[in-house]
A protein has these predicted regions:
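Conserved N-terminal phosphate-binding loop of PLP-dependent enzymes in the Aspartate aminotransferase
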Residues: 1-401
C-alpha cells in the first residue's frame, strides 16, 4: 500500500526508482520493512559520512529540540548553533574563509555564491566545465555541464561558458567579463573525474589575473570524503568561495558558502538584504552539523577515508583483472568509480548488486560509471562483504545477453 501511495502521490523523478520501503537505518546499513538489510555504498548520496543515525548527531538534535527550532529568517537573531558552526568551519578551512552563509541545500548555496560573485564583481559572465553538476535550480542548472539536462529548461542564464575538463589552454576564455568560475575538484556526477593539480593552479592564476572569483563546489567532496577535510587541501589551491552541503548537516538539510568578510559583505548592502533565506542555517541542522564535524575531526575520518578507500580500490583493481567488463577503476579517498563497457552492463551490474543487498548506482552524466561513496565509517569487514557482492554482480553483468 505504501509503495503504491509513493508512486501515486510523491512526485517521481524517474520511471524506475529503487522503491525500497525503509524501516530503519544504522551505520552503513538500511533495513526495509521486511527486515532485509542493505549495505549503503552511496551514504544517502554522500550525506551520511558518519553513517546513518550516528549517536552524537542524535544527541545533538535531541538537545536542540528541547530549546528551539525555527525562530526567524536567516541573519537577524544570534543563534548559538549557527555561530558555533560558522566559527568551527572557518577555523578548519583557514584563510581566506572568515565567514559562512548558511542555506538549506547545495543548490541554494550555489545560487548564493553566483549572486555574490555577480554583485561583488559587477560582472555577469559565468564559467563552468563539461559534465559538471551543481544542482537543479535555474542558476545551478545554467552552469551544468551536460546539455541533455539543460535543454528542456532553456533559455537559462545568459553569458555562461562551458569549458573542457582539465584543458589549461581553454582557460584563456576566462576574461574580465567573468564574475565567477565554478568547478568541482572531483566531478562526482561527471564520472568521478579528478581535476589535475596543474590545471587547478593554472585556473587560480587566471582568475586572479582577470579578477574573477574562483568557486569550488565541494558539496560532494567536502568534510573528509577525499582523504582530506576539504578536497582543495590536496592541491593547495584555495578558492575565493567554498560551497558545502550534503555531509555538512550530518543527515539534516544544510548548505553553506564560505568566503572572506569583504566578499560576503556585498550581500548586506546596496541594497541590504540582497540575499535572504527563511530556513537556511536551521538551528536543528546546525546543531547536527557541529556534532558531525566534531566526530569527523575527533576520529580523523579524512585519514580513515584515505586508508579504507585505498583498501577498497585495491580490491576493485583485483576484480578488474578478473572481469573484462571493467574498463577502469579510479577515484580518491572514499569517492570511487567503476567504469564498465556499456550502459546496459552498468544497469545489470547495479541491479545484481541490489538483489544481493548492496546499494550503488551509476552517475548522472556518465551512464557507464558506477559510483561508490560509502560512509567514512564503513568497516573493513563491510568493505570485504561489498567486494564479494561486486564480484558476483560483475559475473552477472558480464554474461552474454
Amino acid at each position: 500500500m505504501l509503495v503504491r501511495d509513493f508512486q501515486r502521490h510523491v512526485a517521481q523523478t524517474s520511471a524506475a526508482p529503487l522503491g525500497l520501503e525503509i524501516a530503519d537505518a544504522r551505520g552503513s546499513w538500511l533495513v526495509d520493512v521486511r527486515g532485509r538489510r542493505y549495505l549503503d555504498l552511496l551514504a544517502g548520496m554522500g550525506v551520511a559520512n558518519l553513517g546513518h543515525g550516528h549517536p552524537a548527531i542524535r544527541r545533538a538534535c535531541a538537545e536542540q529540540l528541547r530549546r528551539y527550532l525555527h525562530v526567524m529568517v536567516y541573519g537577524e537573531l544570534v543563534l548559538a548553533p549557527q555561530v558555533r558552526l560558522a566559527t568551527r568551519l572557518t577555523a578548519v578551512a583557514g584563510p581566506p574563509f572568515e565567514t559562512a552563509y548558511f542555506t538549506s541545500s547545495g543548490a541554494e548555496a550555489i545560487e548564493g555564491a553566483l549572486k555574490t560573485a555577480r554583485k561583488h564583481t559587477g560582472r555577469a559572465g559565468l564559467v563552468a566545465f563539461e559534465l559538471g553538476f551543481h544542482g537543479d535550480t535555474l542558476g545551478a542548472l545554467s552552469i551544468g555541464g551536460n546539455r541533455r539536462y539543460r535543454a528542456p529548461f532553456e533559455p537559462l542564464l545568459p553569458q555562461v561558458t562551458i569549458l573542457p575538463w582539465n584543458d589549461v589552454r581553454a582557460l584563456a576564455r576566462v576574461d574580465r567579463r567573468v564574475a565567477a568560475v565554478v568547478i568541482e575538484p572531483v566531478q562526482a556526477e561527471g564520472g568521478v573525474r579528478v581535476a589535475d593539480t596543474a590545471f587547478l593552479r593554472a585556473l587560480r592564476r587566471r582568475c586572479s589575473a582577470v579578477g574573477a572569483l574562483l568557486v569550488f563546489d565541494e558539496v560532494v567532496t567536502g568534510l573528509g570524503r577525499t582523504g582530506t577535510l576539504f578536497a582543495f587541501q590536496q592541491s593547495g589551491v584555495r578558492p575565493d568561495l567554498l560551497v558545502l552541503a550534503k555531509a555538512l548537516g550530518g543527515g539534516l538539510p544544510l548548505g553553506a558558502f564560505l568566503g572572506s568578510r569583504r566578499i560576503l559583505a556585498t550581500l548586506a548592502r546596496q541594497p541590504p538584504l540582497a540575499h535572504v533565506t527563511t530556513f537556511g542555517g536551521h538551528p536543528l541542522s546546525c546543531a547536527a552539523a557541529v556534532a558531525a564535524l566534531d566526530v569527523t575531526l575527533a576520529r580523523d575520518l579524512p585519514t580513515r577515508a584515505a586508508a579504507v578507500g585505498a583498501i577498497l580500490r585495491r580490491g576493485l583493481e583485483t576484480l578488474r583483472a578478473r572481469h573484462r567488463i571493467v574498463r577502469d577503476v579510479r577515484g580518491v579517498g572514499l569517492l570511487i568509480a567503476i567504469e564498465l563497457g556499456t550502459p546496459r552492463a552498468t544497469r545489470r551490474f547495479a541491479a545484481a548488486c541490489l538483489e544481493r543487498g548492496v546499494i550503488l548506482n551509476w552517475t548522472l552524466h556518465r551512464d557507464t560509471v558506477v559510483r561508490l561513496a560509502p560512509p567514512l565509517t564503513i568497516t573493513r569487514r563491510e568493505v570485504a562483504h561489498a567486494l564479494g557482492v561486486i564480484d558476483a554482480a560483475l559475473h552477472v553483468a558480464g554474461r552474454p545477453a
